[in-house]
Amino acid sequence: MGMPMVPADTIINRFLQRLTGAVIRGFDRYMPEPFAFGIVMTLAAMVLTYSATPADSHDVVLAWGNGLSSLLPFITQVCLTILFAYALAHLGPVPRYLERLASVPKTARAAYGFVTLFAGCVSLIAWPLGTILGGLMARQIALSFRRRGIPVHYPLLGGAAFSGFVVWHMGYSGSAPLLVATAGNPMEVLLGGLLPVTETILSTFNLVTIVLTLATVTIVAMQLGPSSAEIEEIQEPETDQPASSVPQEHTIRRVGIADKLENARWLTTTLGLILMTYVVSWFYVKGVQLDLNIVNWTFFAACLLLARSSSELTQVFMQAGRAVVPTLLQYPLYAGIMGIMLNTGFVAQIAGFFARIGTTESLPLIAFFSGGVINLFIPSGGAQWAVQGPAFLEAAKVLGTDPALIVMGIAYGDQWTNIIHPFVVIPLLIMTGLPANKVLSYSFIMFLVATLPLAGGLIAASYF
């Protein structure tokens, strides 16, 4: 008698489980916490730049030091996003709505797929929402499942939420495609005009690739659940009570007009309405354009309108303030790394090398892989495009490659390695309370499988 046939899906599941186990063990053993990793990356960037460019050690240190403060406006924006999003999730009816949404998936497998899809969809709307709301949803689902007595693996929920971010640069807030569609952008002369979003973000090949990529990572996330014995549930206590139930800093209640103002709803509501008027006017004038500033002011207006008083809002912000500390500590390190790579010309050197080895059909794919490599050192879509774009657009002009494919190839590479980057994952770690190695071990699996639809989409668009 012949050997019994093993179903193909069983073989695939066994392979994924073994691969996941190996990756988790590797990350657990070799992946330090993000601040330590940032120091290691800094030293590595210094050594690489010193070895591969004419810059001497003094030049490298100066480039690093000059870069440290380059992201301060961005750091402030991200900190405010974290602060407002955290507060918004704990004010008024929002916790109940989040809980209702978190109750949609009924099984652990459905939860892993749901949070991946949710994070991917909000990432397509605006990239700041991907890691913030994705992390909040992962946490809320974990709490919901614990209340219902259903075991769910919290690290996988976090990794799945982060993996949904793999499509952000294909969406509405994609830096590179929006820049080349904007009048007066630095690449306009090189492109011979503007490149409309109908040829990049809204192109058929990009829309199809979005669907295939999200479907791939969602399906794979649903297969990665560990055995019952290995499940790690969320450990934190329930903290979704309104801020008014949290012990107040002032144990002695003040009297008079000061107390009335601090506890008056009309005060925060008035400012919230004024701010919301500005937000509506902004969208009316500029259309549905999302950036960090308008996202922050929209969140802040919502917080003001939902808060019962300035006292309640202050208490919630005080709780949220602890979540901002890791961002303030770690982001300057990556700003320094960007300074090294940009100010010494090392990134332009890398981009130029990759651009020279391409052919008409292969150049978009090379842009994709080189974009992934460069993003590890410059995790900023706009900055990366500014450095990498000129070399690849020049090569595309010579080879006759469609510039839209170059733009999206670099965008795909940027978002591809974002989901394994300790810098990018910080907001999600803050929202979930999970350690980096547990989240990145799962998102690394998604990084591997996302290669197929992302690269495949570019290949299909190049040849067909």
Segments predicted by a language model, with ranges:
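Juxtamembrane transmembrane-helix boundary signature
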Residues: 75-96, 122, 129
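Alpha-helical transmembrane segments of multi-pass membrane proteins
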Residues: 108-123, 148-173, 192-198, 361-375, ...
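Membrane-interfacial loop-to-helix junctions in multi-pass transporters
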Residues: 31-33, 68-75, 103-114, 147-156, ...
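Membrane-core helix-loop-helix motifs of multi-pass transport proteins
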Residues: 138-232, 424-457
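Flexible loop linkers connecting adjacent transmembrane helices
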Residues: 19-23, 59-64, 89-105, 140-151, ...
